[in-house]
Amino acid sequence: KRFIVTEEVYDEFTEKFVKAMADIKLGDPFAEDSDLGPMARADLRETLHDQVKDSVEKGATIRCGGEIPDMQGAYYPSTVLTDVAPGQPAYDDELFGPVASVIRAKDDDDAMRIANDSRYGLGGGIFSRNEDRAIELACNHFDTGMVRINGFGIAAPNMPFGGVKDSGFGREHGGFGMKEFVNVKAVFVY
């Protein structure tokens, strides 16, 4: 996932985020002391690792993780990349695995430009102390199907779920979602 962070808080955020990600314990998902289990398949892990390596070859920096561990199973550690830029898979593509791309933005407007500079648009999030500004950015500047402000979570059954651009067509869930699965018919009686 892409974490677009404004200049004003970038260094502090990145330092704390890298520490938190580095502290995630990889292991058996049934073990109580494990935080992160394996990926679904080894080929998916290989694809993810290739995307990380390609991003690094093109200028990204690994701040934690980024190496396939010597463990049985399709494990991949929580990984943070910085110095992420256009032309790198970590910027341009969806990375399906525990990899976070931290991207520096000058300000809110630059953050929105970067966020929208993607062929995908399923969802996004804005974390801000200024909730009114976050709502304004979400409603008027963020080109995604869903936006969460100051939080994250799974799909809510009463809210439409779906994206824009290459992230799908239509909606599921809620009233809008129900309309995706029915045909509207006009009946005229004279």
Model-derived features with residue positions:
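Conserved C-terminal structural/oligomerization subdomain of aldehyde/semialdehyde dehydrogenase
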Residues: 25-26, 68, 75-190
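Aldehyde/semialdehyde dehydrogenase
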Residues: 1-78, 109-145
